[in-house]
Amino acid sequence: MAAYSFGRVEEAHLEGASNLMAINLLLPGEWFKRDAEVSGFDLPRLKKTYFTASHELIAFRMLEFRPMIVTIFDNGSLYKRKSSYPFTVRPSYPLESQCLRDVTLRGEKVSLKDEETNVVGWPVFREDWKRVILRTEVRD
């Protein structure tokens, strides 16, 4: 019984380890960092290079290399929001709502700036759903 219990604990850790390994295989740290910086952290350009990784995985990998917030909306509803140090995830910045609206209406990349934030939004649209990925950088 103890061996089975131990196996279940290992299994729980195995999933996390497998996810980390997959991220590092699909988006190798040093290569991804270089490519992200060269592209200006442009999601479509990075997707062309790392075509086996999802848009979501690429967007969240960006958090490791520059302070920013990544937000994903599916069909207009918040799906996931994460930030990198030194940011804490706050509900949202006003410009993010405008960027979400503009990307959803236009179906193309939108870049907006104000005195507080730079927000870039990308459409990842399919026939049956509309995903919008936002990258928000807060100015010092």
Stretch-by-stretch model annotation:
Residues 1-140:
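Active-site hotspot residues in diverse enzymes, especially metal/ion-binding acidic/histidine motifs
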